[in-house]
Structure formats: structure tokens, C-alpha cells
Swiss-Prot record:
It catalyses: L-histidinol phosphate + 2-oxoglutarate = 3-(imidazol-4-yl)-2-oxopropyl phosphate + L-glutamate. The modification N6-(pyridoxal phosphate)lysine is found at residue 240. This is Histidinol-phosphate aminotransferase. Transmembrane segments: none annotated. The keyword Oxidoreductase does not apply. The keyword Amino-acid biosynthesis applies.
Amino acid sequence: MSSIPANLPLRNDLIGEEPYGAPQLDVPVCLNVNENPYAPDPAVCDTIAKRVREIAPTLNRYPDREHIELRQAFSDYLARESGTRLDVDELWGANGSNEIMLQLFQAFGGPGRTALGADPTYSMYPEYARDTFTGWKLAHRNADFTLNVDKVLEAIAEVKPSMVLLTSPNNPTGTPLPMEDIERILAACETAEVVGAGEGVHPILVIDEAYVEFRKPGTPSAVSLIKDHPNLAVSRTMSKAFAFAGARVGYLAASKGIIDCVRIVRMPYHLSAVTQAAALAAFEHADEQLSRVEHLRETREATAAWLKEQTYKDQPLEVAESGSNFLLFGGHFDKREAIFDELLKRGVLIRVVGPDGWLRVCMGTDEEMETFRNALVEVLRIVEAA
């Protein structure tokens, strides 16, 4: 039952809607929102405190609305991480990659426009579309959650979207998106029509790389394609591998033209001076912030192998291929809500998300994963027998 008074003039299309959000519960083992479970090192915390202390006397003034120093830090980091050096005017920061995505929908969506995704996909995308009055269409992935590129190309030709939005690694499945698939879709976007737009206007391709630091070593990033493809935008975040979710910092890598479009719709002074200072401090310690990524990859691979050894109703569990810090598993859970509830009773919070029959768990500390494994073995037997 909604708590919103009926006499408030809420938009008609929002009546009955609920705020988005994964459960935030005080439980011993939180494995539901794909955070890095390891806290920042003390040296990182000290540098954050130092940077914030330095700018504190200036908080009576608005921050640098173009956040030039931070955009340079994005450039330096991507040059190391992806091997591609971008100019400052090819980068843009925001309060988490959620705000980046909303800005893209504000700039390139709107009434009469359509965005195209591929399901299963991140559950916030249709909400960005709703909030910007943008149409939302889907091309369906293969049974193993890999992208069906032919279906995407057919949908681009049919729908004539202004944006094509794909996630690599995909959320909630973790499925990597091969570079050759990205390049095929880019080629289609560079000649496709956009419904309601003039001649010579073509859709942009947005690749959401929120989890890309967890990819297998040696796998290239879509950032490497930006210099040759002005219709490509790549979204990144510091919330996942960078262990910086509480700071809410995301960023966009794209051509100057796309960045300038986003700048039109951004709120003035949208990144606070405190946020900018904290992010700069984190980049000073990038190696420390990312030091646990390899261990989390190893945890993912070990957990995937273990899950495949488990059974539910005499069938082995399925595990989707993952290049992220989480695993989608199960495949045939006929009572996934019951499994979720029983795990929660044992202090383990995971996520009911994705297609029916599946659950998602993100990688925690070694101790947290041991608790998860022990609880899951017990819970599967209980739910089977119920």
C-alpha cells in the first residue's frame, strides 16, 4: 500500500510505483549489492581526510563545476588501466554512474525517442527511461546470457533508437561482452536512423563498464575504441572494484561531442568539493584501492566451481559465466524466494534478481564466503524437503 497521499499531484505514470533499491539490512554477511567487501586502507583514509581538510575553508564557495583536476585524474587512471589516453574534454564525472546514465537519457532520450537494451539487464535502465519519458525496448539474450548480436542489429534497424545501452560485464548475469560484438554494433549504429531525427543523425552506443576491472587480465576495455568512434560512450564507476561506493563517484568516457551534450543537462555544481577531494585522494592510492581485485577474481572462480558441485532436487546448480565480482547461480530454483529467506535467517543477504530460477551473490571476504557456503548447503536441503 502506497504511503503517498492521494491528493498530491503525482505524475499519473508514477502512481503505484515504488522507490528503487536493494534491501539495506543490518546482517552479518551482506552479499547483495556487489560492493568491494574490503575497506580502504588507513593510508587512503588519511589522504582523504587531508584533502578534505585542505578544501574545508573554501566550502563557502561553489566547487569547480567542470571538475578539471578530477577529469585529469580519470584520464591518468584510464591510461594505466585500459592503455588509452583520453583528453580532459573526453571525460566527465558525476555522483555515481547512475547519474551518468540519467544524464545520457536526459541528453539523448526524451519524448518520441527510444533506448534499446538487451535483457536480462540492469533494473535501473527502464527507470531512467521512465523518468525521462524515453521509450524502452529490449532485444533478448541467448539462453546462456551471451548477447545475440544479430537480434540486436535487427532491433536497431526496426526500433531506430537514439541510444543502444549494453553492459559489460552484464548485470545481473556477469556475462562479458566480446570486443568484436561491440564493434559490430558500433558499425550498425554509425549508419542507423533515429526515429524522429533528421537525416544524418545516428544512435549512440553506451557501454556500461561498472564491473570492468574484474574482467579477465588481458581483456580490452571499450574505452580503447573511443578515439575512432565518436558515437561511443563508456560509463565507469569507482563504486565496485575501487572500493569507493560510499563516495558516489562515476565517470563517462566519450567523444567531446557526447560530453558537451551531457554538460547541457547536468545540474550546476553537481559534484561537491568534498566529493572531488575524496575522489582525488582515492586516485592517489589507486594501487591500494584495487589491490584486492585479483583475490576477488580468484574468489569468484573458486565459488563458481563450488556452486557447480552443489545440487538442488538432484540437479547440479548452473552458474552463468562471469567477468564481474558476482555470480548468477541456480537456474532451476522453483522456490528462490524461500532460499533467499532462509539464507537471510542465517545472517546472509544475497539478491533475488534476474530471470526466474536464479539468485545472485557477490564476492565477499574469505570469512563471508565460508559463511555463505555453509548456509547455502543447509538451506538447499531445507527448501528441497519443504
